[in-house]
């Protein structure tokens, strides 16, 4: 049942989805109506996000979880970095996928979130995060310099550009 999403796709929010016999509600109980992907993000529409996750399916959804490094250490230059907590793909039910689509059940660190989001909007390049670019002595000598390390590509430049537009709309028109 999985397929790719298209920017022309529309999603009908009637206020909820029923998944495995369980009603999962949108914050807008009377529904948002027919929404584009951009409008669904602007409205933070859980119903549309659940439909999007169902469209791409569990395998593709979890491929993106992995691409964005959720559930893995980022390599940030801080002691005690945590992995976060992600349900293993083979244990995920349709209900889990539905609620994961709007961020529930995904326990990620702030560093993971920032690194992932940065790659989403910077053209799709996931870089190892650092807190400090360089350290210089009082005399101006460079004592430490952290180079940018490209870890992987997460999305295409075209997808990144599209999402930048959608996210601008979230700021301009969203909830």
Regions found by a protein language model. Give the residues of each.
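Beta-lactam-recognizing serine transpeptidase/beta-lactamase-like catalytic domain environment
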Residues: 4, 8-175
């Amino acid at each position: 049942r999985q397929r790719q999403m298209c920017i022309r796709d529309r999603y009908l929010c009637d206020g909820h989805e029923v998944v495995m016999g369980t009603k999962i509600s949108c914050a807008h109980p009377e529904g948002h109506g027919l929404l584009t992907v951009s409008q669904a993000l602007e409205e933070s529409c859980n119903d549309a996000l659940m439909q999007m996750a169902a469209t791409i399916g569990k395998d593709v959804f979890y491929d993106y979880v992995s691409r964005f490094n959720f559930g893995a250490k980022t390599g940030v230059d801080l002691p005690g970095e945590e992995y976060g907590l992600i349900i293993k793909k083979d244990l995920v039910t349709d209900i889990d996928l539905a609620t994961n689509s709007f961020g529930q059940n995904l326990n990620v660190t702030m560093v993971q979130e920032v690194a992932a989001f940065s790659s989403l909007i910077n053209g799709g390049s996931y870089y190892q995060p650092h807190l400090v670019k360089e350290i210089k002595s009082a005399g101006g000598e460079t004592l430490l310099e952290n180079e940018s390390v490209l870890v992987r590509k997460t999305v295409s430049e075209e997808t990144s550009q599209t999402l930048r537009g959608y996210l601008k709309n979230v700021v301009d028109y969203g909830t």
